Amino acid sequence: MVNVFFKQQKFVIKKRFNDFNGFDIEENEVLWFELINPTPNELATLSQEYAIHYNTDHSQRVSSVTKYWEDSSSVTINAFFTNQDENETFHTEMATFILSNNILFTIYYGTLEIFDSIQKKVLASPKKFEDGFDILTKIFEVYFEKGVECLEWINKQTSLLRKNIIFKETSTHDDILVRLSNLQEFNVTLRDSFFDKRRIITALLRSNKVDSDTKNNLNIILTDFSSLVESTTVNLNSLDNIQNLFASQVNVEQNKIIKLFTVATMAMMPPTLIGTIYGMNFKFMPELEWQYGYLFALIVMAISTILPVIYFKKKGWL
Protein backbone atom coordinates (compact mmCIF):
# COMPACT_ATOMS: atom_id res chain seq x y z
CA MET A 1 0.00 0.00 0.00
CA VAL A 2 1.24 3.47 -0.90
CA ASN A 3 0.12 6.72 0.70
CA VAL A 4 1.10 9.81 -1.24
CA PHE A 5 1.10 13.29 0.30
CA PHE A 6 1.33 16.18 -2.12
CA LYS A 7 0.91 19.95 -2.11
CA GLN A 8 -2.09 21.43 -3.84
CA GLN A 9 -2.30 25.19 -3.52
CA LYS A 10 -2.12 25.80 0.26
CA PHE A 11 -3.16 22.32 1.31
CA VAL A 12 -1.56 18.90 1.66
CA ILE A 13 -3.63 16.12 0.10
CA LYS A 14 -3.36 12.43 0.89
CA LYS A 15 -4.12 9.74 -1.68
CA ARG A 16 -3.81 5.97 -1.41
CA PHE A 17 -2.67 3.71 -4.24
CA ASN A 18 -2.06 0.02 -4.78
CA ASP A 19 0.90 -0.77 -7.06
CA PHE A 20 0.78 2.89 -8.17
CA ASN A 21 -2.28 2.16 -10.30
CA GLY A 22 -3.86 5.42 -11.43
CA PHE A 23 -0.98 7.54 -10.11
CA ASP A 24 -1.06 10.86 -11.98
CA ILE A 25 0.49 13.39 -9.58
CA GLU A 26 3.23 15.72 -10.74
CA GLU A 27 6.57 14.96 -9.11
CA ASN A 28 7.18 18.58 -8.10
CA GLU A 29 3.97 18.49 -6.02
CA VAL A 30 4.85 15.36 -4.05
CA LEU A 31 6.16 15.68 -0.48
CA TRP A 32 6.05 12.14 0.83
CA PHE A 33 5.61 8.57 -0.36
CA GLU A 34 4.68 6.24 2.50
CA LEU A 35 5.02 2.57 1.56
CA ILE A 36 3.46 0.25 4.14
CA ASN A 37 4.18 -3.47 3.67
CA PRO A 38 5.05 -2.75 0.02
CA THR A 39 4.61 -5.40 -2.65
CA PRO A 40 7.44 -6.32 -5.06
CA ASN A 41 5.56 -4.49 -7.83
CA GLU A 42 5.38 -1.31 -5.76
CA LEU A 43 9.10 -1.46 -4.99
CA ALA A 44 9.89 -2.15 -8.64
CA THR A 45 7.84 0.87 -9.73
CA LEU A 46 9.56 3.00 -7.11
CA SER A 47 12.97 1.96 -8.38
CA GLN A 48 12.04 2.47 -12.02
CA GLU A 49 10.26 5.81 -11.78
CA TYR A 50 12.37 7.53 -9.12
CA ALA A 51 15.72 5.71 -9.36
CA ILE A 52 15.33 4.63 -5.74
CA HIS A 53 17.14 1.46 -4.67
CA TYR A 54 15.72 -0.50 -1.75
CA ASN A 55 17.27 -3.67 -0.40
CA THR A 56 14.56 -6.34 -0.29
CA ASP A 57 16.75 -8.77 1.70
CA HIS A 58 15.34 -8.59 5.23
CA SER A 59 18.48 -9.93 6.92
CA GLN A 60 20.66 -7.32 5.23
CA ARG A 61 18.19 -4.56 6.10
CA VAL A 62 18.30 -5.55 9.75
CA SER A 63 22.11 -5.57 9.70
CA SER A 64 21.99 -2.05 8.26
CA VAL A 65 19.98 -0.60 11.12
CA THR A 66 21.13 2.88 12.23
CA LYS A 67 23.32 3.28 9.13
CA TYR A 68 23.26 6.44 7.11
CA TRP A 69 24.66 7.04 3.68
CA GLU A 70 24.22 9.44 0.83
CA ASP A 71 25.24 9.80 -2.78
CA SER A 72 25.06 12.62 -5.28
CA SER A 73 21.28 12.46 -5.59
CA SER A 74 19.83 10.92 -2.42
CA VAL A 75 20.13 10.27 1.31
CA THR A 76 19.26 6.84 2.71
CA ILE A 77 18.63 6.15 6.38
CA ASN A 78 17.79 2.94 8.21
CA ALA A 79 16.42 3.49 11.71
CA PHE A 80 14.41 1.51 14.23
CA PHE A 81 11.48 2.76 16.26
CA THR A 82 10.20 1.39 19.56
CA ASN A 83 6.43 1.39 19.83
CA GLN A 84 4.52 0.85 23.10
CA ASP A 85 1.43 -1.30 22.70
CA GLU A 86 -1.89 -0.99 24.50
CA ASN A 87 -1.28 -3.97 26.80
CA GLU A 88 1.88 -2.38 28.24
CA THR A 89 4.18 -4.39 25.98
CA PHE A 90 6.37 -2.98 23.25
CA HIS A 91 7.78 -3.91 19.89
CA THR A 92 10.46 -2.54 17.60
CA GLU A 93 10.11 -1.97 13.88
CA MET A 94 12.67 -0.82 11.36
CA ALA A 95 11.92 1.89 8.81
CA THR A 96 13.87 3.04 5.79
CA PHE A 97 13.94 6.72 4.81
CA ILE A 98 15.08 7.83 1.38
CA LEU A 99 15.33 11.51 0.48
CA SER A 100 15.61 12.27 -3.23
CA ASN A 101 14.72 15.47 -5.09
CA ASN A 102 13.32 16.84 -1.79
CA ILE A 103 10.80 13.98 -1.67
CA LEU A 104 10.69 11.70 1.36
CA PHE A 105 10.16 7.97 0.80
CA THR A 106 9.41 5.87 3.89
CA ILE A 107 9.31 2.10 3.68
CA TYR A 108 8.38 -0.13 6.59
CA TYR A 109 6.69 -3.41 7.44
CA GLY A 110 4.37 -3.97 10.38
CA THR A 111 2.69 -1.19 12.32
CA LEU A 112 4.20 2.03 13.64
CA GLU A 113 1.87 4.36 15.52
CA ILE A 114 4.20 7.32 15.02
CA PHE A 115 3.36 7.54 11.31
CA ASP A 116 -0.34 7.90 12.08
CA SER A 117 0.52 10.92 14.22
CA ILE A 118 2.74 12.35 11.48
CA GLN A 119 -0.03 12.05 8.90
CA LYS A 120 -2.42 14.01 11.10
CA LYS A 121 0.14 16.77 11.69
CA VAL A 122 1.02 17.07 8.00
CA LEU A 123 -2.62 17.31 6.96
CA ALA A 124 -3.50 19.71 9.79
CA SER A 125 -0.59 22.16 9.28
CA PRO A 126 0.30 22.15 5.57
CA LYS A 127 2.19 25.47 5.71
CA LYS A 128 4.92 23.90 7.85
CA PHE A 129 5.85 21.33 5.21
CA GLU A 130 7.58 22.43 2.04
CA ASP A 131 9.64 19.34 1.26
CA GLY A 132 10.57 15.86 2.49
CA PHE A 133 13.20 17.19 4.91
CA ASP A 134 10.47 19.06 6.81
CA ILE A 135 8.50 15.82 7.19
CA LEU A 136 11.58 13.88 8.32
CA THR A 137 12.29 16.57 10.92
CA LYS A 138 8.71 16.33 12.16
CA ILE A 139 9.06 12.54 12.44
CA PHE A 140 12.00 13.04 14.79
CA GLU A 141 10.03 15.63 16.79
CA VAL A 142 7.04 13.32 17.20
CA TYR A 143 9.27 10.40 18.15
CA PHE A 144 10.86 12.60 20.81
CA GLU A 145 7.39 13.35 22.22
CA LYS A 146 6.53 9.64 22.20
CA GLY A 147 9.83 8.94 23.95
CA VAL A 148 8.97 11.42 26.70
CA GLU A 149 5.62 9.66 27.23
CA CYS A 150 7.29 6.25 27.39
CA LEU A 151 9.91 7.41 29.89
CA GLU A 152 7.23 8.99 32.07
CA TRP A 153 5.35 5.68 32.02
CA ILE A 154 8.52 3.78 32.97
CA ASN A 155 9.19 6.23 35.80
CA LYS A 156 5.64 5.79 37.11
CA GLN A 157 5.82 1.99 36.92
CA THR A 158 9.21 2.07 38.63
CA SER A 159 7.76 4.05 41.54
CA LEU A 160 4.81 1.64 41.85
CA LEU A 161 7.14 -1.34 41.78
CA ARG A 162 9.30 0.14 44.54
CA LYS A 163 6.23 0.69 46.75
CA ASN A 164 5.06 -2.83 45.97
CA ILE A 165 8.36 -4.26 47.21
CA ILE A 166 8.65 -2.06 50.29
CA PHE A 167 5.07 -2.47 51.50
CA LYS A 168 4.90 -6.14 50.49
CA GLU A 169 1.71 -5.95 48.48
CA THR A 170 0.01 -8.89 46.79
CA SER A 171 2.50 -9.44 43.95
CA THR A 172 4.58 -12.61 44.12
CA HIS A 173 8.32 -12.65 43.66
CA ASP A 174 7.88 -14.05 40.16
CA ASP A 175 5.54 -11.19 39.22
CA ILE A 176 7.99 -8.62 40.55
CA LEU A 177 10.88 -10.16 38.63
CA VAL A 178 8.86 -10.21 35.40
CA ARG A 179 7.79 -6.56 35.80
CA LEU A 180 11.33 -5.49 36.67
CA SER A 181 12.80 -7.34 33.70
CA ASN A 182 10.23 -5.86 31.30
CA LEU A 183 10.89 -2.32 32.52
CA GLN A 184 14.64 -2.78 32.18
CA GLU A 185 14.31 -4.19 28.68
CA PHE A 186 11.92 -1.44 27.58
CA ASN A 187 14.19 1.27 28.97
CA VAL A 188 17.32 -0.17 27.32
CA THR A 189 15.52 -0.55 23.99
CA LEU A 190 14.37 3.07 24.15
CA ARG A 191 17.89 4.17 25.03
CA ASP A 192 19.33 2.38 22.00
CA SER A 193 16.65 3.95 19.83
CA PHE A 194 17.49 7.45 21.10
CA PHE A 195 21.19 6.84 20.42
CA ASP A 196 20.16 5.73 16.95
CA LYS A 197 18.32 9.00 16.29
CA ARG A 198 21.24 11.06 17.60
CA ARG A 199 23.63 9.39 15.17
CA ILE A 200 21.24 9.96 12.28
CA ILE A 201 20.66 13.62 13.12
CA THR A 202 24.39 14.19 13.55
CA ALA A 203 24.96 12.74 10.07
CA LEU A 204 22.23 14.95 8.61
CA LEU A 205 23.83 18.02 10.17
CA ARG A 206 27.02 17.24 8.25
CA SER A 207 25.20 16.87 4.94
CA ASN A 208 25.25 19.67 2.38
CA LYS A 209 21.83 18.51 1.16
CA VAL A 210 20.12 19.90 4.27
CA ASP A 211 19.32 23.62 4.33
CA SER A 212 20.21 25.91 7.24
CA ASP A 213 16.67 26.22 8.64
CA THR A 214 16.29 22.45 8.79
CA LYS A 215 19.71 22.16 10.44
CA ASN A 216 18.67 24.65 13.11
CA ASN A 217 15.60 22.53 13.89
CA LEU A 218 17.69 19.36 13.88
CA ASN A 219 20.14 20.90 16.35
CA ILE A 220 17.28 21.52 18.77
CA ILE A 221 15.98 17.97 18.32
CA LEU A 222 19.50 16.59 18.83
CA THR A 223 19.65 18.34 22.21
CA ASP A 224 16.22 16.93 23.07
CA PHE A 225 17.30 13.37 22.32
CA SER A 226 20.45 13.87 24.42
CA SER A 227 18.22 14.77 27.37
CA LEU A 228 16.18 11.60 26.78
CA VAL A 229 19.35 9.51 26.82
CA GLU A 230 20.22 11.03 30.21
CA SER A 231 16.72 10.22 31.45
CA THR A 232 17.10 6.57 30.42
CA THR A 233 20.35 6.46 32.39
CA VAL A 234 18.52 7.77 35.47
CA ASN A 235 15.82 5.13 34.96
CA LEU A 236 18.44 2.41 34.65
CA ASN A 237 19.98 3.47 37.96
CA SER A 238 16.54 3.52 39.62
CA LEU A 239 15.74 0.04 38.29
CA ASP A 240 19.13 -1.24 39.47
CA ASN A 241 18.38 0.16 42.94
CA ILE A 242 15.02 -1.59 42.92
CA GLN A 243 16.71 -4.82 41.89
CA ASN A 244 19.14 -4.48 44.81
CA LEU A 245 16.25 -3.64 47.14
CA PHE A 246 14.34 -6.71 45.97
CA ALA A 247 17.41 -8.93 46.38
CA SER A 248 17.91 -7.56 49.91
CA GLN A 249 14.29 -8.24 50.78
CA VAL A 250 14.56 -11.81 49.50
CA ASN A 251 17.73 -12.30 51.57
CA VAL A 252 15.97 -10.98 54.68
CA GLU A 253 13.06 -13.36 54.13
CA GLN A 254 15.43 -16.27 53.58
CA ASN A 255 17.35 -15.35 56.73
CA LYS A 256 14.09 -15.32 58.69
CA ILE A 257 13.29 -18.81 57.45
CA ILE A 258 16.80 -20.04 58.25
CA LYS A 259 16.58 -18.42 61.69
CA LEU A 260 13.24 -20.11 62.35
CA PHE A 261 14.59 -23.54 61.47
CA THR A 262 17.75 -22.88 63.48
CA VAL A 263 15.74 -21.94 66.56
CA ALA A 264 13.46 -24.95 66.08
CA THR A 265 16.49 -27.21 65.81
CA MET A 266 18.11 -25.72 68.90
CA ALA A 267 14.85 -25.96 70.86
CA MET A 268 14.45 -29.63 70.00
CA MET A 269 17.98 -30.63 70.95
CA PRO A 270 17.49 -30.79 74.78
CA PRO A 271 14.31 -32.93 74.65
CA THR A 272 15.96 -35.12 72.05
CA LEU A 273 18.92 -35.58 74.37
CA ILE A 274 16.60 -36.47 77.27
CA GLY A 275 14.66 -38.92 75.15
CA THR A 276 17.91 -40.47 73.96
CA ILE A 277 19.15 -40.92 77.53
CA TYR A 278 15.98 -42.70 78.62
CA GLY A 279 16.08 -44.78 75.49
CA MET A 280 19.45 -46.34 76.36
CA ASN A 281 17.72 -49.25 78.11
CA PHE A 282 20.31 -49.60 80.88
CA LYS A 283 19.30 -52.21 83.42
CA PHE A 284 19.61 -49.91 86.42
CA MET A 285 17.68 -46.69 85.71
CA PRO A 286 15.59 -45.66 88.75
CA GLU A 287 13.07 -43.67 86.73
CA LEU A 288 12.10 -46.74 84.70
CA GLU A 289 10.59 -48.36 87.78
CA TRP A 290 9.04 -45.14 89.07
CA GLN A 291 5.28 -44.80 88.77
CA TYR A 292 5.51 -41.22 87.47
CA GLY A 293 8.71 -41.69 85.50
CA TYR A 294 7.06 -41.35 82.09
CA LEU A 295 5.18 -38.17 83.07
CA PHE A 296 8.33 -36.78 84.65
CA ALA A 297 10.31 -37.34 81.44
CA LEU A 298 7.62 -35.62 79.34
CA ILE A 299 7.56 -32.59 81.67
CA VAL A 300 11.35 -32.29 81.61
CA MET A 301 11.34 -32.53 77.81
CA ALA A 302 8.64 -29.84 77.54
CA ILE A 303 10.49 -27.51 79.92
CA SER A 304 13.76 -28.05 78.05
CA THR A 305 11.97 -27.05 74.84
CA ILE A 306 10.28 -23.94 76.26
CA LEU A 307 13.32 -22.51 78.06
CA PRO A 308 15.47 -22.04 74.90
CA VAL A 309 12.51 -20.39 73.12
CA ILE A 310 12.08 -17.93 76.02
CA TYR A 311 15.81 -17.23 75.97
CA PHE A 312 15.81 -16.59 72.20
CA LYS A 313 12.88 -14.20 72.55
CA LYS A 314 14.62 -12.22 75.28
CA LYS A 315 17.66 -11.93 73.04
CA GLY A 316 15.47 -10.69 70.20
CA TRP A 317 16.32 -13.57 67.93
CA LEU A 318 12.65 -14.42 67.34
UniProtKB/Swiss-Prot annotation:
Q: Where is this site: Essential for ion permeation?
A: 255
Q: Which UniProt keywords apply?
A: Cell inner membrane, Cell membrane, Cobalt, Ion transport, Magnesium, Membrane, Nickel, Transmembrane, Transmembrane helix, Transport
The subunit structure is: Homopentamer. In the absence of Mg(2+), interactions between subunits are weakened, and dimers, trimers and tetramers can be observed in vitro.
Q: Which PANTHER family match?
A: MAGNESIUM TRANSPORT PROTEIN CORA
- Tell me the domain comment: The central ion permeation pathway is formed by the first transmembrane domain from each of the five subunits. Mg(2+) binding strengthens interactions between subunits and leads to the formation of a symmetrical homopentamer surrounding a closed ion permeation pathway. Co(2+) binding also induces a conformation change. Low Mg(2+) concentrations trigger both a conformation change within each subunit and a loosening of the interactions between subunits. This results in an open ion conduction pathway. In addition, this results in a less symmetrical shape of the whole complex.
Q: Which is one Pfam family of this protein?
A: CorA
Official protein name in the record: Magnesium transport protein CorA
Describe the family membership recorded for this protein in Swiss-Prot or TrEMBL. Answer: Belongs to the CorA metal ion transporter (MIT) (TC 1.A.35) family.
The gene it comes from is corA
Lineage, top-rank taxon, reads Bacteria
Could you give one GO CC term from the UniProt record? plasma membrane
Probable selectivity filter (motif): residue ranges: 279-281
Q: Name one GO molecular function term.
A: cobalt ion transmembrane transporter activity
> What is the originating organism of this protein?
Helicobacter pylori (strain ATCC 700392 / 26695) (Campylobacter pylori)
Q: Where in the cell is it found?
A: Cell inner membrane
Q: What does this protein do?
A: Mediates influx of magnesium ions. Can also mediate cobalt and nickel uptake. Plays a key role in the adaptation to the low magnesium conditions predominant in the gastric environment. Alternates between open and closed states. Activated by low cytoplasmic Mg(2+) levels. Inactive when cytoplasmic Mg(2+) levels are high.
Q: Which residues cross the membrane?
A: 260-280, 292-312
Its placement in the membrane is given as: Multi-pass membrane protein
Question: Reaction catalysed by this chain?
Answer: Mg(2+)(in) = Mg(2+)(out); Co(2+)(in) = Co(2+)(out); Ni(2+)(in) = Ni(2+)(out)
